[in-house]
């Protein structure tokens, strides 16, 4: 099919999942529960995966990191909206996706995903096509410039070997993607995001995906260590739960990954592990002028050049 051996991609993804969950468990002090799953014969999707989840830890209220490798007879609409020529194509997809919801409101929520998708177009003598996607983004509840700068600098450094254009392109893509249109609001401070990517050739495109995945711990752990023991009270916890509601709204209304999983017959329990354990909504919640909560909206939930 290509110069990419799918077993090589799978081995990398499984190793990445293991490295990340080991490091997070070390910080938290509680191990991840591991759930090996297999799609049942006769289901639309076939394949398997490993869901690792940590709940009610010391640092993380919920931290989920999932690997999946599935095959299906027909790409769902969410995967073909930018590639209409692949409508009806059989496909194979694998990836690692994580969302970590910290307990302390001063520690930001984080999301990271790296994935590969291969599809065989309908028709005679059609060559299979393969592409990569991925990225990471940070969603603070209380904004700190040094955290945002650090996160974006690591993202930029991970992409530098693949061209100076990649970080600004993928940062803009991230800002545009993680936007709640119905709220006219950014989800967080962004990061980098790319999809349907093969322009460097398959080997280098895979290498770029690897670099992004490998840089995750360097981007996130220093922020966790800096904020996890900060003192907080009921006010900060209440605001954290309110802002988590926005995370839920984005994932269920706008996220292509969630839609892809649900439309293709994916494993619902694993797809929805990105949901926070608790969230809240209140009607037209005001923010006190000059407060840290107002500062989040004015200075952090806006598109900015952090590096």
From Swiss-Prot:
Record keyword tRNA-binding present: no
Cofactors that this protein relies on: a divalent metal cation
Coiled-coil boundaries: none
Quaternary structure and interacting proteins, as annotated: Homodimer.
Ligand binding (substrate): 97, 113-115, 265-267
EC numbers: 1.3.3.3
GO biological process, one term: protoporphyrinogen IX biosynthetic process
Gene3D superfamilies in the record: Coproporphyrinogen III oxidase, aerobic (3.40.1500.10)
UniProt-annotated site: Important for dimerization, residues: 182
Signal sequence range: none
Pathway(s) per entry: Porphyrin-containing compound metabolism; protoporphyrin-IX biosynthesis; protoporphyrinogen-IX from coproporphyrinogen-III (O2 route): step 1/1
A Gene Ontology term for the protein's cellular component: cytoplasm
Active site: residue positions: 111
Entry protein name: Oxygen-dependent coproporphyrinogen-III oxidase
Subcellular location: Cytoplasm
InterPro entries: Coprogen_oxidase_aer, Coprogen_oxidase_aer_sf, Coprogen_oxidase_CS
Pfam families assigned: Coprogen_oxidas (PF01218)
Purpose of the protein: Involved in the heme biosynthesis. Catalyzes the aerobic oxidative decarboxylation of propionate groups of rings A and B of coproporphyrinogen-III to yield the vinyl groups in protoporphyrinogen-IX.
Keywords attached to this entry: Cytoplasm, Heme biosynthesis, Metal-binding, Oxidoreductase, Porphyrin biosynthesis
